[in-house]
Amino acid sequence: MNQLCVERNLSISTAYIKSKPKKYIERIKKKKSSNKSIKSQHKFEGSKIANKNNELKDIKSKDPKHYENHINKNTKHKDILLKSKRSDNFKFSRRGFILSFTGNLEDFYNLSEEPLGKGTYGCVYKATDKLLKIQRAVKVVSKKKLKNIPRFRQEIDIMKNLDHPNVIKLLETFEDEEQIYLIMDLCTGGELFDKIIKKGSFVEMYASFIMKQIFSVLNYLHIRNICHRDIKPENFLFYDKSTESLIKIIDFGLAAYFNDIDYEMKTKAGTPYYVAPQVLTGCYDYKCDLWSAGVLFYIILCGYPPFYGESDHEILSMVKKGKYNFKGKEWNNISEEAKDLIKRCLTIDSGKRINASEALKHPWFKKKKGSFNLDVKMDIHVLENFKNYALLLKLQKLAMTIIAQQSNDYDLQQLKTVFLYLDEDGKGNITKNQLKKGLENSGLKLPQNFDVLLDQIDSDGSGRIDYTEFLAAALDRKHLSKKLIYCAFRVFDVDNDGEITTAELAHILYNGNKKGSITQKDVNQVKKMIQEVDKNNDGKIDFYEFCEMMKLKY
């Protein structure tokens, strides 16, 4: 693993979050008592903001009109504070928060007896965190069955780099002597394949809802020089059972990086019905994913594949010829625009084949406006959350990012919809101009020092606002449950002894995200971050202090 592997101590975790033995309760009471007599030398701007938000909620419930006036009244004060952030160039990457551990997985998770499904390298099980009772999905891979360990490591590396609403989230990994475990977000809505079987085919409106997500995620992957190489309905899961559930792409076991020069890949990979002709020759590029998407598109409109046969050999023979038609009665009511988009995906010559970005701009999507094209508005509370986030302490920002990463999509449904609406070009992140346009279209007045605000939201300094960055900044504090607070604390507390040290925080912040070794300047910055919230001045942060920092009662 790229990240440091450590042993996790279950007994300490249980003491903090579940059973709380007497000695730990006494320890916490002692800390609370001592904290009262300590005059903190550090002001918590984030804490002030949290208290101010509680006042605003009361005002909003009693007098909505007065609420907006009250918001505007506080804007000048926050704008002044934002000016002081102009010189703050603190940047970090969420990749460092996806840790790898050694030890017995079943000390931390209860696994279901029956697998949810099978992937390229192993089975996926439903799992429940023993302490937090949060449900996850766990991919279990036997080391003995791994024929190509470097390729599997690449799958993990690829997943750590991805941050998109339509990509399954990797949360952490475990490893013991026999197996490797990938802990991921749990999808409960079933496979796209199963829905196709159940419905037979989709109407064009719903098909546009599905295909826009598929082309968007392919555009996101291809921009990052990643080719999935196994696009098929079995590799898309519905997040939940709702009618407008988003889909998530899974199983990056066959995914590969390609270079910017010739784009060529040579390993034969894929599934017969969906594989592109060039893959069969052993010389192809990233547009093999577009061919597969075209096949999938064809299937969801009519219920059967464009290339079929009694055996894999017959199917592949049909694929090589690339001949298909729209002659069945199922196609009588399908628009010419839909057929044209399929043709552009199923073009034999990959050089002339449409790419994902071009597909998203196809007239069919403009004609069949699906759920992504709804007139989404951001309310003033989202803008206030942006301002509040920009004024947080560094460690608070790190914690909010982890909380956004660990939260399930049920809690973030509205924000997720807003993000997808703002992502007009389907790149999986939004530009500062797109966010500005979204705020203006929602009738919200842009604050002074808006560029400073955007720079604070762009936590990795990429110039664009990624999905988790947006969620962390827009997330309402009402989602800060003790479970989510502990999820963040557990990431920082690498050895699980109940305290966050300078070494642990430096490891999380810089390991895997920094070229070269950690400098003294880096260490000093981490020490300062700890000092800002270390109320008893012992040089460490315990869970009580962490909760105080996030303004959640322990």
Curated annotation (Swiss-Prot):
The active site is at 230 (proton acceptor). This is Calcium-dependent protein kinase 3. One of its GO terms (biological process) is positive regulation of cell motility. It catalyses: L-seryl-[protein] + ATP = O-phospho-L-seryl-[protein] + ADP + H(+); L-threonyl-[protein] + ATP = O-phospho-L-threonyl-[protein] + ADP + H(+). It is an enzyme of class 2 (transferase). The lineage of its organism: Eukaryota, Sar, Alveolata, Apicomplexa, Aconoidasida. Its cofactor is Mg(2+). GO terms for cellular component: cytoplasm. Disruption phenotype: In the mosquito midgut, the number of oocysts are reduced which is caused by a failure of ookinetes to migrate to and transverse midgut epithelium. Abnormal motility of ookinetes, characterized by frequent flexing, bending, twirling, pendular motions and a failure to disperse. However, another study shows no defect in ookinete motility. Development and morphology of ookinetes are normal. Sporozoite motility and infectivity are normal. When injected directly into the mosquito haemocoel, thus bypassing the requirement to transverse the midgut epithelium, ookinetes mature normally into oocysts. Residues 30-55 are annotated as: Disordered. GO terms for molecular function: ATP binding; calcium ion binding; protein serine/threonine kinase activity. A motif (J domain EF-hand interaction motif) lies at residues 394-403.
